[in-house]
């Protein structure tokens, strides 16, 4: 795999970006009434993160054993895990960016069952321990680009999805891969109450083409910053597809099903004119309500370093993935 030449040490999102006192952060950002002229969805959640009292951090996960392949590393320092994952979209636990960290402790992640089924020769089931022991784990520093036009760079820990799918032996009929989040309304308030959960239909579902799922970049993720994922980041296992918008990164997965037909996806069902199936990061295809040409990068340095920067096609991974979409109209297939 070609080493990612775009990342440098200053690009890594410092963990100090999370759990800062909100008055300090607002002052550092220079947020004012003028900022409210921006498209609502592009700024409202950023503001909502800072309102109310500080929330306690979720318990730290257990340390993981993993390698650091040079193709995914830049000798970047990591900061303590107790300051990570305070700015999340996980509507099952609420709409504010701070809600998942405050509320996701209710999610029971052990025991856990992940089933692989559908168009496969060998259906299989993984339990909680399998997720961290069945495959060698590796740390990968990836960009993460939210459809809301903000971005981070995060050191995820996991294993390539293609290794898991290979064990199940996809049949020649398999064309797509469908994913499903756990449905546990007694643990996830957003699944109980449509107001809390943003009016989405649950359980959350996502999908990829089989060739996208088999790409070496596509990661089944079980950890971050050296330890097991905290609940608000999608414990015990989530998907990371770094060239796509973050909503494709389905969390707390319990089912992977290989299918002949393209599977439904949650945000496409909710607003098909705004959220496509492919969801490839593309500065030339705007969201109907805001531009995707630039993004707010939440980075390292000082109290909080948030800078506007150009959005990269395929989130900077064009050299690796553009060939997947040769001949495909990226405006029509957004």
Curated annotation (Swiss-Prot):
It comes from Shigella sonnei (strain Ss046). InterPro entries: MsrP, OxRdtase_Mopterin-bd_dom, OxRdtase_Mopterin-bd_sf, TAT_signal. Residues 1-44 form the signal peptide. Predicted to be exported by the Tat system. The position of the signal peptide cleavage has not been experimentally proven. GO terms for cellular component: periplasmic space. One of its GO terms (molecular function) is oxidoreductase activity, acting on a sulfur group of donors, quinone or similar compound as acceptor. It comes from the Bacteria. Keywords: Metal-binding, Molybdenum, Oxidoreductase, Periplasm, Signal. Its EC number is 1.8.5.-. This is Protein-methionine-sulfoxide reductase catalytic subunit MsrP. Belongs to the MsrP family. Mo-molybdopterin binds at residues 88, 91-92, 146, 181, 233, 238, 249-251. Heterodimer of a catalytic subunit (MsrP) and a heme-binding subunit (MsrQ). CDD domains: YedY_like_Moco. The keyword rRNA-binding does not apply. The lineage of its organism: Bacteria, Pseudomonadati, Pseudomonadota, Gammaproteobacteria, Enterobacterales. Part of the MsrPQ system that repairs oxidized periplasmic proteins containing methionine sulfoxide residues (Met-O), using respiratory chain electrons. Thus protects these proteins from oxidative-stress damage caused by reactive species of oxygen and chlorine generated by the host defense mechanisms. MsrPQ is essential for the maintenance of envelope integrity under bleach stress, rescuing a wide series of structurally unrelated periplasmic proteins from methionine oxidation, including the primary periplasmic chaperone SurA and the lipoprotein Pal. It is found in: Periplasm. Binds 1 Mo-molybdopterin (Mo-MPT) cofactor per subunit. Its main location: periplasm.
